[in-house]
């Protein structure tokens, strides 16, 4: 039996876009120089100072997917390395959602951080080219039945596109598509009693036909 099949085996899943914020990891970096070192390494691959961007912005630039992706890759690896330095348990499985797949590859040693940052910068540029900023949007829908979200997306689409993009967990779905269609879907969901539906801080409608 391999480690992944053992009872209580640890799995780490790295996140995708949307969790970036100005000042992220600032406090940890004051205690652990390895945080900033990871950002510097990733900056060499991305061709931009990711630490300066993540600490001082501008926020609009950090929110553009070609910069969001390498910045979050750097953040994920910085935390992963700190986990290792602090004696964190060795996971049996490393995985990731969307961008997080690249973070998992770097953490597993299949890619260097520099190469990973270079790749996701290009990935972000290609995604932004497919749907220029402002064209698309994404939103998280909490506490709604899958069938309701799917029906609302169909109703809101019209001549545009809005679809369930990610089924994150029971009761948590991310929708995405044309910005106006996403807005229509959010309004319909509120009308139908959905308790929480919020726009995400992303500049492209990932995992939708617009990509």
Placement of each model-derived feature along the sequence:
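Helix-rich "cap/lid" substructures immediately adjacent to catalytic or cofactor-binding pockets
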Residues: 2-95, 175
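Alpha/beta catalytic cores of group-transfer enzymes, especially the acyltransferase/condensing modules
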Residues: 17-19, 46, 68, 108-211
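Short acidic, glycine/serine/threonine-rich loops at helix termini
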Residues: 25, 106-108
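An amphipathic alpha-helix/helix-turn recognition signal
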Residues: 37, 71, 98-99, 111, ...
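A short small-residue
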Residues: 55-62, 103-104, 196-200
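Short, glycine/charge-rich beta-strand/loop segments that flank catalytic centers
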Residues: 59-60, 95-99, 124, 136-140
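Gly/Ala-rich beta-loop-alpha elbow adjacent to hydrolase catalytic centers
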Residues: 76, 92-100, 104, 112
